[in-house]
Amino acid sequence: MEVHRMRLLVLTTVIVALNLGLANAQSIINDPEADTGVLRPDFSANRGPMVAIDSGHNNYHTIDHNFGPFASLLRNDGFRVVDTKALFTGDSLSPYKVLVISNALPAALVNDWKLPASSAFSAAEIDVIKAWVMGGGSLLLIADHRPLAGSARDLALAFGFRWEDGVVARDPMDGRRDIFTRADATLLDDVVTRGRDAGTVITSLRTFGGSGFRAPPDARPLIVFPTGFMNHECGLPCPADALESDATGYLQGAVMPFGKGRVAVFGEAAMFSAQVWTTLKPPFRFGFQAKGAEQNKQFILNLMQWLAGILPER
């Protein structure tokens, strides 16, 4: 029990440091020193497909808060990136090619993550998003640990993805970073990881805690948890008596064609941006500028090009 308690304590400390925590929400910010340059932009400036980043559902990650470097990277590749605070309707989604939703929450959970998870989206909004993707739109849906995964679960389920509302992590006593590679078959071969040429092939990715899910048969796994990862049935802080189960084979990233559109689902948000925890001395930086995440930037560009229809479906 004492070993288990120590592991959970370390787990909580590590994941809060790397990603989310209500008490630290204001001290984790967009990294102003992040390198968001693109050597070979795919589009002329502001001439690419339009990407909307949701901020209308109490999102933890928005352009202004923690996803600024993500938006800057896309703009430097030529994408037209906008913030959207609107409820999802056919009219509100019609201008966009790609919709990005990261870590949405219902109003009841904004200030109390201990409450039971509930959907961040109404049933009507979920139906609208599903129809929009079926008609040719593309969705990037991202949700971290409990209750964020639980708040995205109904939307994910509309596309056949089944989220575990917990925290998936390696035993923190192990000490290794969460790095997924082609060499160990935790990062899989796909058009997204192959990119458009030899210079955009992805062989390694780093993530920072997060959640796991099961995917429908038509989905293509990209990031797969190997032996040694556990799903902890808790939010943060994680209590010592939290139940845990083997997460081997669960996914942290997958893509899928859906009707005329495309869907990408990921159980971790920090990998897509560059953030800094300002109250630590020295400030702690994590995201695509962290050690071991050197290929994350190119992966983001590959993924967005796939969602925008620039890369082939397969």
Walk through the language-model features, giving the residues of each.
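Bacterial N-terminal signal peptides that target proteins for export
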Residues: 1-10
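Bacterial N-terminal signal peptides
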Residues: 10-19
